[in-house]
Amino acid sequence: MSILPIVTAPDDRLKQKSQPVLEFTDQTRKFMDDMLKTMYHEDGAGLAAVQVGVLKRILVIDIKDHDSVERPKDFYPLFIVNPEMIEKSEELIKSNEGCISVPGQRIEVARPESIKIRYLDYHGKSQELKANDWLARVIQHEYDHLEGKLMIDYLSNLKRDVVLRKLKKLKNNIV
């Protein structure tokens, strides 16, 4: 497995909508394994394919150490391909979020407390998942990436511009 390079804001790829995965191959699964290794390397809770420069509707998530729900031993890591959001609660919960693609920033985002998604798993099998609390938040955060939306898009224009200037400065100092 390989560690993949992370795409960081303000890269234009992060603003594009990701495309569905049309066929499952060994190469698809290897890519998902590489995504997972990259997410662990970056100490993340989730990762979308676009965050490693691939505009495909693939998410990997592992919050087993922070999940408030008792789950089967093999529940994590979650491989979520071509997710569809089929339910969202009306109740919104505000919480601070971080993002591998928006380094050094914590932003308060209001999200539905619970959701239900339909997706394909690691083997291409259709699944449905009801999630609440932290898992629901992580899924929604990563799902936003598939839609070309970043957590900073929940900020006012002024605050978003300040964050983007900081990120550009950080990027210029690294390069």
Curated annotation (Swiss-Prot):
Active site located where?
142
One of its Pfam families is Pep_deformylase
Q: Which CDD domains match?
A: Pep_deformylase
Keywords carried by this UniProt record: Hydrolase, Iron, Metal-binding, Protein biosynthesis
Per the UniProt record, which EC number(s) apply here? 3.5.1.88
Question: What reaction does this enzyme carry out catalytically?
Answer: N-terminal N-formyl-L-methionyl-[peptide] + H2O = N-terminal L-methionyl-[peptide] + formate
Stated role: Removes the formyl group from the N-terminal Met of newly synthesized proteins. Requires at least a dipeptide for an efficient rate of reaction. N-terminal L-methionine is a prerequisite for activity but the enzyme has broad specificity at other positions.
Q: What is this protein called?
A: Peptide deformylase
Q: Which organism is it from?
A: Rickettsia akari (strain Hartford)
